Swiss-Prot record:
Organism from which the protein derives: Thermosynechococcus vestitus (strain NIES-2133 / IAM M-273 / BP-1)
Family per record: Belongs to the bacterial solute-binding protein 1 family.
CDD domains: PBP2_FutA1_ilke
A Gene Ontology molecular function term of the record: metal ion binding
Protein name: Iron deficiency-induced protein A
Protein encoded by which gene: idiA
Its biological purpose: Plays an important role in protecting the acceptor side of photosystem II (PSII) against oxidative damage, especially under iron-limiting growth conditions. May also be part of a periplasmic ABC transporter complex involved in iron import.
Length: 355
C-alpha cells in the first residue's frame, strides 16, 4: 500500500490577502474573462489552504458572474470523496499540490481530459498532463538548504552527490511518506533507472543526520541549528521564514543559504501545484474558464506574490524574496512521470531504509 504524507499548510495572513485583493480588483478591464458573463456556479475541491487563493476566486466571480463554492481538505481525502460520490459528485474542479497527487486522481478516473488553447499555450508541456487531464498552476523547486557556517556552496552540486560518503550524517529531509520526496525519487527513477536510483537512495539514507521527522520548515530549522549541514526542501519554505514577522524565523533564515542542484546538467527538480476538471463536472465549461483564468497574467502574479511560488506563465514577475534566490535551470522531465513512477519509487525508498 502506498504511504501518503500529510501536507502541512501555512496561511499567508491578512497582509498578503489584502495585496492580492487590491491588485486583482485593478486588473485590466479589457481582460477576455471580464468580457464574458454567463453566470452559474462551479464547485472547487481544493487541497490548497491559503486565504489569498480565496481572493483569486472572488475576483473570478466578479469578472465572470460564476460563483465559486470551495470545499477544502487534504488531497487524498478529496480524491476519495470524489470517488465515493461517483456520478453524483458536485465537484467541477480538483486543485492540489504535487503532480504525484494529480496523477493519483487521474488514475482513479476522477479527472477528464480537456482541450484548451489558452492552457496549452500558457502552461509548458512538461508541466501539464499530455492528454489534458491536469495542468500546472505554479512551480515549486526542490532545492538544497545549507548551513552557511558549515558548508561552502562550492561543495554542493547535484541531488546525486547527496549520496556521497562525504556527507555522512549531514543530510536532513522528510520521511518517505512525503509526496515531495516520492516525486523527487520518481524523477530520478525516470532519469537513471531503478538500479542507480536505489543505489542513490541507500547512500542518501546512510548520510541522514537524524531519522526523518517534520516538514520542510523543520528541516531548515535543524540545518540552521547544526543538526545537519544540508537540508532538502521546497524553495518557498525558506522564503516564508525570510518574510516572517517573527524575529526567530528570520534568524533561522539568516544562517542558511539556498542552492539550486544540477545546474550544469539537466536542472533542478520542478514540481507543481495544479488542477484538473472532474469527470462528469456539472459545469464543465465554467470549470475550463476557471482554469484559464488561473493562468492569466494577474492571477499568476498573485500566486507568485502570495505564496512565493514560481508562475507557470512566462514573463510574470516573482516575489522580490524569490528573485534574490537567483535564476535557475529547471529540469524538462514531464511532471506526469512523478506519479507514474510513484509506486516503484516507494518500493525503492522502503528497500533503502528511508522511513
Amino acid at each position: 500500500m502506498e504511504k501518503v504524507g500529510r501536507r502541512v499548510f501555512l496561511g499567508m495572513g491578512a497582509a498578503a490577502t489584502a495585496y492580492v485583493t487590491h491588485h486583482l480588483w485593478n486588473q485590466n478591464a479589457e481582460s477576455s474573462y471580464a468580457q464574458q458573463s454567463s453566470g452559474g456556479v462551479i464547485n472547487v475541491y481544493s487541497a490548497r489552504h491559503y486565504d489569498t487563493d480565496k481572493a483569486l476566486y472572488n475576483t473570478f466571480t466578479q469578472q465572470t458572474g460564476i460563483r465559486v463554492n470551495i470545499i477544502e481538505a487534504e488531497a487524498d481525502a478529496l480524491i476519495e470523496r470524489i470517488r465515493s460520490e461517483g456520478s453524483r459528485t458536485p465537484a467541477d474542479v480538483l486543485i492540489t499540490v504535487d503532480a504525484g497527487r494529480l496523477w493519483r486522481a487521474q488514475e482513479a478516473g476522477i479527472l477528464q481530459p480537456i482541450q484548451s488553447r489558452v492552457l496549452n499555450s500558457v502552461v509548458p508541456a512538461n508541466l501539464r498532463e499530455p492528454q489534458g487531464h491536469w495542468f500546472g498552476l505554479s512551480r515549486r523547486v526542490r532545492v538544497l538548504i545549507y548551513n552557511k557556517s558549515r558548508v561552502n556552496p562550492s561543495q554542493l552540486s547535484t541531488y546525486e552527490d547527496l549520496a556521497n560518503p562525504k556527507w555522512r550524517r549531514q543530510i536532513l529531509t522528510r520521511s518517505s511518506s512525503n509526496i515531495y520526496n516520492q516525486s523527487l525519487t520518481g524523477s530520478l527513477l525516470a532519469i537513471h533507472g531503478a538500479q542507480k536510483t536505489e543505489q542513490w537512495a541507500r547512500g542518501l539514507v546512510q548520510n541522514f543526520a537524524r531519522p526523518p521527522e517534520g516538514n520542510d520548515t523543520a528541516q531548515i530549522r535543524a540545518c540552521a541549528e547544526g543538526v545537519g549541514s544540508v537540508a532538502i526542501a521546497n524553495h518557498y519554505y525558506l522564503a516564508r521564514l525570510i518574510a516572517s514577522d517573527k524575529e526567530q524565523d528570520r534568524a533561522v533564515a539568516a544562517k542558511v543559504g539556498l542552492f539550486f542542484p544540477n545546474q550544469r546538467d539537466r536542472g533542478a527538480h520542478v514540481n507543481i501545484s495544479g488542477a484538473g476538471v472532474v469527470a462528469g463536472a456539472p459545469n464543465r465549461q465554467g470549470a475550463i474558464r476557471f482554469l484559464e483564468y488561473l493562468v492569466s497574467p494577474k492571477a499568476q502574479e498573485m500566486f507568485a506574490m502570495a505564496n512565493f511560488e514560481y508562475p507557470v506563465r512566462a514573463g510574470v514577475p516573482v516575489h522580490p524574496i524569490v528573485k534574490q534566490f537567483g535564476n535557475f535551470r529547471g529540469q524538462n522531465v514531464n511532471a506526469a512521470v512523478f506519479g507514474r513512477n510513484n509506486a516503484e519509487a516507494l518500493r525503492i525508498m522502503d528497500r533503502a531504509g528511508w522511513r
